[in-house]
């Protein structure tokens, strides 16, 4: 708090922060100006001149090389948190400001759950060839979410205020008339206990619950004949969610005051009491609105037994699913507001009348729809057995939530995406072959194509209520835009998965196996903020203008043909020039070297039978035997866009997308190196 960010991978601590568009993605000096001519000047330290022509690197390349070497050599002081420095900062702060907040501390984020479940099933076989089943499943759960101080790192206490809100108060005060007391309220994490001094173990920041109920009523008929099996089932699901909070957040109070007609969306049913300064007593909670959903599902399937060793199976399903709480509440740490589709669902009749839509359209608008089908052929012979499956699934009206620091607004924002359609299709095959008495060879192949099949609709709002834009009448509003994701791959892991396993089993209960796996077509998760329609066209879907879009960079990043016409990809998205295309293109995670796409695992074990049906099982497993630490298991684009201020007579203080496209590099997850597991089990 009020101190430098200690994270080693914070962008200001990375080598990429030191250069200004003159290093390519492989760390090589580009050596060209943006108009393509050779650059021969000296380091001027300015980056851009007034007419927008690039004139050279803004840093000494030796400094960049030195920092890069520290990272690649895994220097502890560079790649790890300097804990000694954090303690030293807190000790100095204790001496200078003993009643103030510690500079650094370690917090613990709690995400606990309590749940209970009831299952009732009834089965009837009184009709020949028919098994009829009905069931009821009910589940109640409560998600408990809060933060606590884990370690003060030598500090005296932590003052529970929001640093982002405290910094942004000057901007907030311009939105509505605010007294000094009002301004101080905004930064409080709990208005009922302002400026609380929190010590080790104390709760801070947020403390809320999500209460969820879920009940399923279903019925299924299964028909079984000599050559054909048939089933069909129908299910209705009721679900509800409701947020309560033990803290009255100052940003929620501010947003309710800023939007009095929608105050209950931020503070729940007690909004007016809170705005009047009547905060809940200790031990009491602010209760948000309950949201209720009813979702139907239907499935049907059949099996055709060609003969005793070959058969075909086909399945189909259609259903709707209410959003999960994590995809419904925009910023539950701060306020009670949910995505817009849920309020349309809650008041379906009113919205249908207002917009001329159907009641069913509004009621099911918040639920994701899904339809799927699959076909499987399987075989089973004495020496070989296996199956091959083709599948196709279509999703409609999905929801995603994102939060990030916006460099243009200079505050933390929440982004809610709705109307997301996806298609998952592919083929899976598996076979096992016996190789003599002791060995079995098993192969598995899965090839999928998981893509987004529509663009999304985005609503972006500042968590602290800051005005992100103004309409023609000067009124503040949230940013509404399309997100151009149609055709992107869904980041669900590798879409090509293959493995070959050789297994050994001895009658004296020794067993071992070695598995070689190959993975491909793995993609980085996209950042919606980098693919907003307004960034490509200069105008958002809501009609507002964008300050600093891709066509308003120093060199106009939009790719054009020889006739000056904008070039589009096959999904209608304008193409960008290098290096700006690095900001929006989806990256494949697969390593360039083929051998880095393999993982090898081995295991060996022994089962020992004892007297009186007792036994001991010993199993040793070695994962990633070849220690392949270059294997990327996932990752994501950072949502932040590099911004810089274009200087000049006509462009003074005009914010544009900067040329240092590697300023906020993507984050990656890597496979663990070689690791061992020894499992010993005693059964009695």
Task: Indicate where each model-derived feature is located.
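Face-selective signature of the C-terminal outer-membrane beta-barrel domain
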Residues: 1-248, 305, 387-388, 442
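Flexible, surface-exposed loop regions and adjacent strand-edge segments
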Residues: 3-19, 148-159, 246-263, 328-337, ...
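Extracellular loop and loop/strand-boundary signature of outer-membrane beta-barrel proteins
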Residues: 103-108, 117, 121, 156-158, ...
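Structural signature of Gram-negative outer-membrane beta-barrels, strongest in the C-terminal barrel
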Residues: 115, 129-133, 137-141, 154, ...
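Residues on the lipid-exposed face of transmembrane beta-strands in outer-membrane beta-barrel proteins
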Residues: 118-124, 134, 217-223, 236, ...
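Short loop/turn motifs that connect adjacent beta-strands in outer-membrane beta-barrel proteins
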Residues: 123-131, 227, 307-309, 383-385, ...
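Gram-negative outer-membrane beta-barrel transporters
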Residues: 224, 385, 390-402, 411-530
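C-terminal beta-signal and adjacent terminal beta-strands/loops
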Residues: 518-580, 606-684
């Amino acid at each position: 708090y009020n101190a430098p960010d200690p994270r080693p991978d914070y962008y200001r601590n990375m080598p990429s922060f030191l250069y200004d568009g003159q290093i390519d993605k492989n760390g090589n000096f580009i050596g060209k100006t943006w108009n393509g001519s050779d650059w021969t000047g000296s380091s001027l330290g300015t980056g851009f001149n007034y007419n927008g022509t690039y004139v050279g690197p803004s840093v000494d390349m030796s400094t960049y090389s030195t920092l890069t070497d520290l990272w690649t050599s895994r220097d502890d002081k560079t790649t790890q948190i300097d804990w000694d420095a954090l303690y030293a900062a807190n000790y100095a702060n204790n001496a200078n400001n003993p009643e103030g907040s510690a500079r650094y501390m370690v917090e613990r984020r709690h995400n606990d759950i309590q749940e209970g479940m009831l299952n009732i099933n009834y089965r009837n076989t009184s009709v020949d060839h028919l098994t009829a089943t009905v069931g009821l499943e009910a589940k109640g759960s409560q998600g408990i979410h809060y933060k606590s101080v884990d370690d003060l790192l030598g500090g005296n206490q932590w003052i529970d205020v929001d640093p982002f809100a405290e910094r942004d108060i000057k901007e907030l005060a311009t939105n509505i008339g605010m007294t000094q007391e009002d301004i101080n309220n905004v930064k409080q994490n709990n208005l009922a206990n302002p400026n609380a001094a929190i010590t080790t173990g104390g709760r801070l920041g947020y403390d809320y619950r999500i209460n969820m109920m879920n009940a399923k009523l279903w019925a299924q008929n299964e028909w079984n004949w000599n050559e054909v099996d048939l089933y069909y089932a129908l299910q209705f699901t009721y679900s509800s969610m409701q947020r309560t909070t033990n803290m009255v957040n100052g940003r929620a109070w501010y947003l309710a005051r800023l939007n009095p007609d929608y105050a209950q969306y931020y503070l729940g049913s007690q909004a007016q009491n809170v705005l009047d300064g009547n905060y809940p007593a200790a031990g009491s909670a602010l209760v948000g609105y309950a949201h209720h959903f009813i979702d139907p599902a239907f499935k049907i399937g059949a099996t055709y037994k060609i003969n005793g060793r070959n058969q075909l199976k086909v399945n189909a399903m259609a259903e709707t699913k209410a959003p999960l709480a994590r995809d419904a509440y925009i910023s539950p740490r701060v306020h009670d507001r949910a995505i817009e589709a849920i309020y349309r669902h809650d008041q379906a009749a009113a919205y249908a009348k207002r917009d001329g839509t159907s009641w069913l359209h509004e009621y099911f608008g918040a639920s994701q729809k899904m339809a799927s089908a699959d076909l499987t052929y399987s075989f089973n012979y004495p020496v070989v057995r296996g199956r091959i499956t083709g599948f196709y699934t279509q999703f409609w009206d999905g929801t995603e939530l994102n939060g990030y620091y916006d460099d243009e607004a200079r505050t933390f924002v929440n982004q809610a995406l709705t109307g997301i359609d996806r298609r998952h299709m592919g083929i899976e095959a598996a076979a096992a072959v016996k190789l003599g008495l002791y060995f079995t060879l098993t192969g598995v192949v899965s090839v999928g194509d998981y893509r987004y099949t529509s663009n999304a609709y985005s609503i972006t709002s500042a968590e602290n209520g800051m005005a992100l834009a103004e309409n023609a009448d000067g009124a503040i509003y949230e940013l509404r835009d399309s997100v151009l994701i149609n055709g992107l791959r869904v980041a669900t892991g590798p879409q090509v998965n293959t493995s070959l396993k050789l297994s050994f089993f001895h009658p004296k209960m020794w067993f071992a196996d070695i598995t070689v796996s190959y993975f491909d077509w793995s993609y980085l998760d996209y950042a919606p903020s980098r693919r907003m329609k307004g960034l490509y066209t200069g105008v958002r879907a809501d009609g507002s203008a964008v300050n600093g879009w891709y066509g308003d960079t120093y060199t106009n990043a939009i790719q054009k043909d020889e006739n000056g016409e904008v070039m589009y990809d096959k999904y209608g998205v304008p193409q960008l020039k290098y290096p700006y295309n690095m900001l929006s293109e989806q990256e494949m995670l697969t390593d360039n070297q083929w051998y880095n796409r393999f993982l090898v695992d081995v295991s060996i074990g022994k089962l020992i039978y004892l007297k009186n049906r007792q036994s001991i099982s010993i199993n040793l497993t070695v994962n990633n035997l070849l220690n392949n630490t270059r294997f990327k298991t996932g990752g994501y684009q950072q949502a932040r866009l590099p911004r810089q201020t274009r200087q000049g007579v006509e462009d003074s203080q005009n914010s544009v997308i900067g040329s240092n496209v590697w300023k906020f590099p993507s984050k990656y997850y890597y496979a663990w190196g070689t690791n061992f597991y020894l499992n010993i089990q005693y059964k009695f």
